[in-house]
Structure formats: structure tokens, C-alpha cells
């Protein structure tokens, strides 16, 4: 049996998910494929892109400390989350082929988790495990077993397989029609070469800062903090307050972007994506990582030079490394891609929508 799971792109809603905010994300064409079958033993045998096979004993599903940060943890964690929800977990073999570079920003870990979930769904549960359940199981695998403080956006986009508007406070999940091409725009990503691997602490710091602000106002997350109270009753840590301000403003931009997409409003889409990008750079500050890798920063700067006045550009996903996302006039895309490739390597810039 062959199973495909797409990668994902975050269109708007940068670091809003873990504060129960809103986001628009979309599945993208690059993804992962597994050729799989049942096995007689209660083990998962997985070989990815021809590398050395991995074997996981599925009779032992508790988190294993030494597996944190590894693919083994994702396999075990996905099986654990499914079994906890009453689904059948059985042995399988899977040959995986991936078009998603690990740490490149298209959510390779989320796609892999969902892929493993789809394998177990198809082989042992009649393909009946719904996308939202697969996404929640994938989040649990990443958070508990892998040790990554992930939200739910990546997993939902990979599992649902199309553009989707998500409100994490209300659990509203609305599939969207996303046609930038009809607006004369091309959505693309440039992989700057930096990796998301090893950036867990940078991501965790954003979450800590936002949670510190929400706790100051007696709430668990920023979504339930009154914005007027936030503005009038100053939080003393200026750095954390800036990140909170990003959340409040970004969370209001998401439904505006959704409306602009629905009515085919080219200028609106460019405006809201640019506002999101500048807020991430200046307030959220997830462009340069603590390790000092500045390739993403250079990608943002080059995109600004190339697209100012005609397109939109922003950090993609978690940030600190990885990809620059851009909405480029379709008749200018070839020139933009050529310039980005010249700086970051052949085929580093690719059209995704």
C-alpha cells in the first residue's frame, strides 16, 4: 500500500497556535510517501530514504528518554497516542521517501507523524481515523515523546491536506479555497539552508515569554487576556511584552487575510502578509537564532530588496532558520527565484502554490 502525506506552509498566524490563537495554513505539494504492509511481529520497521532501518517495539509505548529528538520517538509516540484513544496498533514495515528536508521549515516531523498514523489507520483501522485525531496524536507524539513544544497547526495542515483556517480557542476548523494564481500571484518558499534542528530552546523562549505575560494577567494563554488591559497595565519585561503585542495584532490579521483570500483581493493579501512579516521581524524576533546563523535574516533582506512595492515576504513557520515565504507577482517569479537561487543554491526557491 502506498500512502502520501503533504508538507505544510503557514500562510499567516506566526506563533499564534500555542496561545490558542488563529492561523491559516495549507498543505503543499512536497511531502512524504510510505510504501507499507502489515508484519507478523508487533514491531515497526521503517527505512527512510534508503538509510539504515529503524525498529520500534510497539509493545512498549511509554516515552524513552534517550529517544528524545529522534525519529524513533515519533514512531513510538504516534503508536502510543493512537492506542490510548482505543485504536488498534499493529506491526508494520514502511519504506519512506521524503521531499521535505529535515529542519527546512515544511514540517517534516509533523508530516512524518501523520504519515505513521495514516499507515496504522489504513493497515489496522480500516482507514477510519479522522484527520483531526491524527493531527492531535501527532502533536502528542512531538510534545511528549520527541520533546518538541509544538502547537497543532503543522499537524492539522498535513492531515487535512488543503488550506485551512483554524481557531484554537473555539476548535473551529474551516477548509479554504486558496487560489493565489487567480490574483496573478505565486506563493513560494526559499530554503536558506539553515536548519530548524536544535532550535527547541529558541522556540520554547517565545512560548515562555508569552505565557509569562498571560500569567501576569491571570490567564493561561494570551488569547484570554484583554488587549486593552494589556495596553493600559504595562508588563515590565519589554521583550516579552513585544512578543505578546505581536500575538494580539497577528491574531486580528488572520481573519482579515481569510476574507481577502475569499474575495480574491490581491492587495489585501499582500498587505496582511507583509504586516505579518514585519511583526515577526520586529516584535516576535524569530529571525536570527541564538547560535548566530544569519542565513534566514539574509533571505529576508534580499526578499525585501527584490519585492518591495510589488510583493510580500515573511519568515515561514517557527523561524530562526529555514525558509522565507513570499507572494510574488507571477510574471516576476522567474526573476525572483533566479536571484534567490544565486544566493542560497540552485532550486532553493520553489513554487508551492
Residue spans of the language-model regions?
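C-terminal nucleotide
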Residues: 1-8, 12, 33-70, 165-314, ...
Amino acid at each position: 500500500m502506498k500512502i502520501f502525506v503533504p508538507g505544510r506552509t503557514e500562510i499567516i498566524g506566526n506563533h499564534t497556535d500555542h496561545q490558542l490563537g488563529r492561523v491559516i495554513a495549507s498543505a503543499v505539494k512536497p511531502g512524504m510517501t510510505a510504501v507499507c504492509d502489515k508484519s507478523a511481529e508487533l514491531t515497526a520497521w521503517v527505512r527512510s530514504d534508503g538509510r539504515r532501518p529503524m525498529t520500534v517495539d510497539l509493545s512498549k509505548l511509554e516515552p524513552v528518554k534517550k529517544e528524545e529528538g529522534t525519529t524513533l520517538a515519533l514512531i513510538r509516540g504516534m503508536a502510543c497516542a493512537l492506542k490510548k484513544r482505543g485504536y488498534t496498533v499493529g506491526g508494520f514495515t514502511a519504506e519512506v521517501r521524503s521531499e521535505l528536508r529535515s529542519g527546512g521549515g515544511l514540517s517534516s516531523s509533523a508530516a512524518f507523524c501523520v504519515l505513521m498514523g495514516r499507515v496504522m489507520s489504513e493497515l489496522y483501522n480500516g482507514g477510519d481515523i479522522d484527520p483531526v485525531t491524527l493531527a492531535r496524536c501527532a502533536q502528542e507524539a512531538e510534545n511528549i515523546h520527541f520533546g518538541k513544544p509544538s502547537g497543532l497547526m503543522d499537524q492539522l495542515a498535513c492531515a487535512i491536506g488543503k488550506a485551512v483556517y483554524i481557531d484554537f480557542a473555539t476548535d473551529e476548523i474551516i477548509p479554504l479555497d486558496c487560489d493565489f494564481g487567480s490574483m496573478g500571484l505565486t506563493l513560494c518558499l526559499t530554503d536558506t539552508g539553515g536548519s530548524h534542528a536544535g532550535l527547541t530552546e529558541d522556540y520554547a523562549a517565545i512560548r515562555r515569554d508569552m505565557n509569562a505575560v498571560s500569567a501576569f494577567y491571570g490567564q493561561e494563554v494570551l488569547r484570554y487576556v484583554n488587549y486593552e488591559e494589556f495596553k493600559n497595565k504595562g508588563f515590565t519585561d519589554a521583550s516579552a511584552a513585544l512578543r505578546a503585542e505581536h500575538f494580539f495584532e497577528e491574531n486580528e490579521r488572520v481573519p482579515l487575510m481569510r476574507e481577502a483570500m475569499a474575495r480574491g483581493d490581491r492587495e489585501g493579501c499582500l498587505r496582511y502578509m507583509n504586516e505579518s512579516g514585519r511583526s515577526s521581524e520586529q516584535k516576535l524576533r524569530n529571525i536570527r537564532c541564538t547560535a548566530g546563523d544569519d542565513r534566514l535574516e539574509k533571505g529576508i533582506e534580499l526578499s525585501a530588496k527584490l519585492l518591495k512595492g510589488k510583493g510580500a515576504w515573511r519568515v515561514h513557520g517557527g523561524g530562526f532558520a529555514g525558509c522565507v515565504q513570499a507572494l510574488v507577482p507571477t510574471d516576476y517569479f522567474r526573476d525572483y527565484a533566479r536571484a534567490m537561487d544565486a544566493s542560497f543554491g540552485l532550486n532553493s526557491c520553489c513554487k508551492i502554490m
